[in-house]
Amino acid sequence: MEKDYFSQKPNSTVVIPELFIAISLLAAILATIFWFAPRPRLNSDAPKSQVPANFSLESLPEWLHEHEQSHGSVIEGAEATIDWATKPEVTELCVLYVHGFSATRQEIAPIPEKVAAHFGANVVHTRLAGHGLSENPMAATAEDWLQSMVDAWEIASRIGKKVVIIAVSTGAPLSIWLNEQVIEKDRVHSFIFLSPNFRIRNPFGFLLTWPWAESWVPLVIGREHSWEPENEMAARYWTNRYETQAVIEMQKVVDWASKLKPDAEQAPMATLYMEDDPTINHTAAVAFHRRWPAGDKQLHRVTLDAQNPQHVFAGDITAPHRTDWCVDVCTRFIEGIR
């Protein structure tokens, strides 16, 4: 008699559970490997300041100049600087400006300078490590950027009784790190963020810090990233070609900030953003602002020329037509706190 292989299922009750167990075990092993595998993560420990503790106010600009010169290839106009309101003395407010990824202090100039002048405040312009270099640009790590932040804060806190931090794009999460890890909270007057990067626009940005990303991401998207600057000044003061590793370093900072859940009362914050920002996810920027636990907060959607969204939406280089509006928003916000 011929066997009926369709009706005869002698091992079906055994094979199916065994297959399910095997698949489940494999999934568990892969999940464990994925969870514990090495991945790019920010070492958020605060480095020690490199600024000499015993230097007078008059000596700080000279130290900063020599420190910048030690890097050898800093583009003129991109270097970190101290701008005194009048003379070397402590002012009621100091403006600390933190530029964004691949940019320099010229990014939104002259907005920080005009805001500072309005209040008779000193200004510290940060230059994040690896930025603004003519040779080997953007080769620094995110942890090197933290060192730049610590040094900039050390100077700003010495030359101002309170500090207004103005930051653009990735400068915003770096400023939040500074607030959490380094500074005395009562020394921060306020935060003013322009296009803050708490998530990049590309929905696959999270892959930049997946396990072994430093090995496989450059193979997928290329070892270099480049873009076409919109004018000669943008070409000078932004790095428009850099290794993909630099983008991974940026994502490390964003990841750290996205996990932060501040619960204590914080310094006032103003956030300025454009809908449909081509670089960052503006919804994430708004969400971070709304969960920031501060009594004084202002959220400003840029409506001037809103049909032409820009990431760097103000400043002489990229959008001079919005500069005065931005200065007015910033000064009114600060005045409302004082």
Q: Where do the language-model regions lie?
A:
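Short, surface-exposed "cap/lid" segments of acyl-processing enzymes
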Residues: 73-131
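Short alpha-helix in the alpha/beta-hydrolase fold that links the catalytic acid
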Residues: 110-111, 267, 280-291
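Catalytic nucleophile-loop/oxyanion-hole region of alpha/beta-hydrolase
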Residues: 133-159
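Gly/Ala-rich beta-loop-alpha elbow adjacent to hydrolase catalytic centers
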Residues: 166-175
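Active-site nucleophile loop of the alpha/beta-hydrolase fold
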Residues: 192-203
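Short beta-strand/loop motif that positions the catalytic acidic residue
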Residues: 265, 271-273, 277
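Catalytic histidine neighborhood in serine/cysteine hydrolases
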Residues: 292-313
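Catalytic active-site module of serine/aspartate enzymes centered on a nucleophile-bearing elbow/loop
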Residues: 307-338
